[in-house]
Amino acid sequence: MTSTINRQLLEDIDAHAKHLRFMYRIKGFGYERAIELPLIAEKLQPLFGKKLRYLDIGTGPSIFPSWIATHTQWDVTCLDKFTWVEVQNTYARKLGLDTSRFHVLVHDFLDVELEPESFDVITNISVIEHFEGRLDEVAMAKSARLLRPGGVYVLTTPLNEGYARDWFVKQDVYGESYTSEPVFFQRHYDVASFNERIVKASGLVERERIYFGDYDEPFFNDRIVEQHGLKKIGRTLLQMQTVKHALKHGSYRDVPVSMPGMKIYTSAGVCVQMTK
């Protein structure tokens, strides 16, 4: 099975991003997100006409919750441990959103107390890979308890079959200071570790799984990530046409990307839809 990105949804999300931030008009809102977000939107779209409670975990400056809020009457909650999530309030004002149904919480997800089974929809978008050690399993179990019976849980995360890896960097990361020892940044799962640490740990029922990325040409890996010197100019020129390149190189399949030379940032991953 091979399917392509929903052009209409991608262009709509891109227009939303450009309205929110001038930077996105210049460099796009992220090539990897241009593959990932339309897929999530497509999975949630059948629910848009209902009045639901929605939680996005690890929101940060993501454009997705505000996009959802403009297309639905959902009660939206954005949650992140860092204050950068407060930009969501700026987005809400710019879009004229009803703030009685758009909430921004600055809390560590592992510590915050939320009512069990209180959300109809939960998204976990390229976040779970940043939980160090076995905390990803803890986070999955905790977040699953927040889902109402019959609710929808959509998660995406990097996956590189045959090359699972924990990445450490020599710089400050998400509040962790680099001194002498490299700091954990994120994880690339493989199918086995994803099944064990994400799906099984959640206790939820998997309904659908789709792998995504650049299959025919490693465009993002070779031409966007970690470019130096004059190559940065070429990268920026490519980023200015994020939508065009995502439509050309990105796709969805029933088999995962497997790339021995994959860099730390990747457009390759998995999207799983689960329920209770």
Ranges and model annotations:
Residues T123:
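A conserved beta-strand element that flanks and buttresses the S-adenosyl-L-methionine
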Residues E132-R134:
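Short N-terminal helix/helix-N-cap motif within the alpha/beta-hydrolase-1
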Residues S126-H130:
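Short catalytic micro-motifs in class I SAM-dependent methyltransferases
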Residues M1-P46, G60-D111, V154-K276:
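Class I (Rossmann-like) S-adenosyl-L-methionine-dependent methyltransferase catalytic domain
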Residues G49-G60:
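Conserved class I S-adenosyl-L-methionine
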Residues D111-E117:
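Short amphipathic alpha-helix with an adjacent loop that forms part of the alpha/beta core around
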Residues E137-P149:
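A short glycine-rich, Lys/Arg-flanked "PGG" loop and its adjoining helix->strand segment in the class I
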Residues G49, R148, V199:
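Short conserved AdoMet
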